[in-house]
Amino acid sequence: MSKIAYNYIQIFAAVALMGYWCTNSIATFLFGDTPSVVSIAYWAVLLAMSIIVMRICRRDIQIRDNRFLMCYTVIMFAYVIRMFIDMVFGPFVGEVPNTMFLTDILVVGCGVFVTTFALMSCRHYLDINNICKLIYWIGFIIILIIPHITELDVDNMQDAEERMDAGRGMGSLAIVKVGVIEIIVAIHLILNNKRKYLYIPGLLFAIWTTLAAGSRGGLIALIVALFYYLIINSRKNIFKLLLVVVCLCAVIVYIIPILEWISEYFPVIGYRMLETVVENDQSGREVLREKAYELIYNNPVLGYSYRLVPMPTGYRCHNGVLDIFLAFGIPIGLLVLYVAYFKSIIMATSLMDKKEYFMPVVMTIWVLVASMSGSGITDATFCFTMCLLGTIYYRSKSNLI
């Protein structure tokens, strides 16, 4: 099978998948038990996204080296804006079901359409470094005003409920996502620019903000992503690889003293991480997983649609893989996992030898790992978009399939 034919088949499968996704939601809307008109618009935007990606694929032989990186970073820029909106308007999002999907439409719709126009109009002037600088400075401004918006007071928060109240609903989760994105972008700019001192303040502020917010999922995912990058990037040098493995073992062995030291300065995240390590506290996720297994067993083929999953906490079980199976059923869920997770990791690993790919590689692994403990459907949807663009880029550079 030729590479072009293989591309067409994969993109056709992607469009078929999104078509099923959209059609299923419309059918549910027409026959009752509907999510809402907002959700229908959300699926329609996803379908339009797939069509745009398919049209880009028609010219995949002519795609330039950094077009994927531009697409990816522009979508991530929209993702940062979405997290900021969630952080500011968290109480309104929590009181009105489905309102939060308006921001998802902004992420997918604006991200893809802005990327498309950018590629057509200013592809000669827009590169990953400039986009990272834009994300860095906007993120730096957001981080500076976060304490005033969220009234974040780490000294008076001792449990998850207080943490969520201080973060205004979804605020603490949004803060962590903004902080982690700022950390990754800042490290990327430090690695790839001569004026490294410009990006050190943003890195330090982002680390403080991420720790102060107290949400552990995004932070753990970042640690996993960084070690994954270091291990794979050192695979050709046995001494570097041994050094990374020794550091990883040291972190594992001394994890409790490290967390106790962190607790002195950031009591919320330190306390919650100690609960996770010492008592295996999962904030009730084990109960949600058992419920998810039962629901998947009862309806393994069709699933329950995105907004109709009858979970105790609403529409998700805080596990990206199980969320996908709940929403789509096992057959379509396996296709989503193959494209969004497996192909993403292969694509990211293939780019690890060059430091200019630090941001997209670490961001890819971070989003994948974070979706395993957070809002799986939204993050997996983003992974799916990124993977399609990444596959186009990767195949334009290699004959491997």
Segments predicted by a language model, with ranges:
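N-terminal signal-anchor transmembrane segment
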Residues: 1-58, 74-87, 147-148, 367-369, ...
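Transmembrane alpha-helices of multi-pass inner-membrane enzymes
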Residues: 14-18, 184, 359-370, 376-401
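Hydrophobic transmembrane alpha-helices and their immediate junctions
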Residues: 58, 130, 328-368, 393-399
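Alpha-helical transmembrane segments of multi-pass inner-membrane proteins
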Residues: 129-155, 170-232, 365
